[in-house]
Amino acid sequence: RATFTPEEVCTLVTEFYRRNYIEGLFLSSAVCKNPAHTMELMYRTLHLLRNRYRFNGYIHVKAIPGAPVELIEKTGYLADRMSVNLELPTGEGLQKLAPQKTQKAILKPMRQIQSGIVDYRLTAGKSAFLERSSGNRYLSHSIFDTRKQISASAADLGWISSSSARSLPEKERSAPFVPAGQSTQMIIGATKENDYQLLSTSQLLYQQYDLKRVFYSAYIPVNEDSALPSRE
């Protein structure tokens, strides 16, 4: 398994950026040692890019389920977008193919990121909800309708406590928090959900977590396992 140090990632990104090869960075990682260690490395990478290398390009970073809330919060003040992979459309599918993971553990950082976005937007005098494209605003009964109302207190949404939010310096907390919103991705075809289940999950994510995008990734068989669909 290949790994890069935060300094190596920063060097690559800044060199590519100077040559106009890239406009931004998508930073993701498998779990290295444990979620806390992995998230710490990702935070250090973003902190170096923004502060030492003065990188002002777009950054999308994955949040690692199980990582400390403080690390996810600090990372959110350095990233443009964050995402947490839902992995599979239903909890039953996740339990079948990845029993070491739980949907609750995946949704926890997703809710925390949503709370931080709401807190920042309300402080900045904006609507709690992310803006949608103009076409979506005029569609009746769209997938974005009947979203749960969010109060002015991000702590009311749960998962992230007001004490952890106050742990950051005032200057850092006043910065934009994940201004481009959060997204997720789920694998389609590895489990037997029907279209109604897939769209219901997407609707729930848009309405209850105010995601900017739900992405779908087609299942591609790599390993042989009786729990996985046949290659035929």
Predicted regions and their residues:
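Conserved Radical SAM active-site core
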Residues: 1-181, 188-191, 205-206, 220-230
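Ordered, small/hydrophobic-rich secondary-structure cores
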Residues: 186, 193-196, 200
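Helix-loop elements that line ligand-binding/catalytic pockets
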Residues: 200-219, 231-232
